[in-house]
């Protein structure tokens, strides 16, 4: 700018945020920025029919932000809907057969009531006739991270047991664990002890929760993720509250709201991304 030059700033809108400089530049004309609005449909190299297939089934607000390049006010919006997880308005039976069963683990460091818990969700993946998931079971506990070394083998055993029930053609894939904090220790111990455990891609775990939710929204909204009757009806006491914590955390997640219980929510996001994404969760 000292040489009378120009500056270009480009990005995808991310919510309505008066403190965000990109939002200010696009909406406060007194700042002097000239706006170039480029929704995906304006790209001449993209086939309109292909774009229609891409956005089909995605939540309207996701389409508005990610594809129409508009600023969306997410405040107060429950992101996931119960109907998306049901088939004809009801949870589903365990699959008669599937390709594999795997679990996804979110680890806590401390076991006090005010701290996060440790959680696991087990999924069945079937690629026929097209890739889809069934949530088989879930668990959430309040325990110090040190003692997870005794719990993880039990959760791995459950993945094996569920793979037998669901006649998994490729057997169990094991457990996917966040590669950070307590998870690093568990992955190292698992390698030494021969556990069937794998790290969740660090690029995926480093994304904000909102970005991870948007990342899987198309799969969930289009009916590629179903919840089993067992997981739907399950009630567990956790933090002095007895209820279905999986449904509560997933369905009551609100973008932009702080201090939400998210142990099972994280497992849900990672599990869907790993099962239906590109292998690295995207």
Regions found by a protein language model. Give the residues of each.
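Mg2+-dependent endonuclease catalytic cores in nucleic-acid-processing enzymes, primarily RNase H-like
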Residues: 74, 78, 126-253
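Short His-Asn-centered micro-motif
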Residues: 10-12, 105, 177-180
């Amino acid at each position: 700018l000292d040489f009378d030059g120009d500056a270009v700033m480009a990005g995808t809108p991310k919510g309505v945020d008066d403190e965000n400089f990109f939002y200010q530049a696009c909406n406060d004309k007194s700042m002097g920025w000239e706006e170039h609005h480029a929704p995906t449909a304006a790209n001449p190299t993209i086939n309109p029919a292909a774009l229609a297939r891409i956005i089909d089934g995605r939540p309207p607000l996701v389409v508005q932000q990610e594809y129409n390049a508009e600023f969306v006010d997410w405040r107060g919006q429950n992101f996931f809907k119960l109907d998306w997880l049901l088939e004809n308005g009801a949870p589903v039976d365990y699959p008669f057969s599937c390709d594999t069963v795997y679990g996804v683990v979110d680890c806590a460091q401390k076991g006090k009531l005010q701290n996060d818990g440790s959680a696991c969700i087990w999924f069945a993946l079937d690629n026929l006739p097209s890739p889809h998931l069934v949530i088989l079971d879930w668990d959430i506990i309040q325990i110090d991270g040190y003692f997870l070394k005794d719990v993880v083998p039990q959760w791995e055993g459950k993945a094996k047991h569920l793979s037998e029930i669901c006649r998994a053609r490729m057997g169990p894939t094991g457990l996917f664990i966040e590669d950070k904090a307590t998870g690093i220790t568990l992955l190292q111990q698992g390698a030494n002890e021969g556990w069937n455990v794998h790290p969740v891609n660090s690029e995926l775990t480093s994304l904000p929760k909102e970005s991870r939710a948007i990342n899987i929204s198309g799969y969930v909204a289009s009916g590629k993720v179903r919840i089993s009757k067992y997981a739907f009806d399950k009630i567990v006491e956790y933090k002095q509250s007895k209820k279905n914590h999986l449904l509560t955390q997933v369905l009551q997640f609100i973008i932009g709201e702080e201090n939400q219980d998210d142990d099972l929510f994280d497992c849900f996001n990672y599990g869907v991304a790993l099962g239906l994404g590109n292998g690295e969760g995207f």
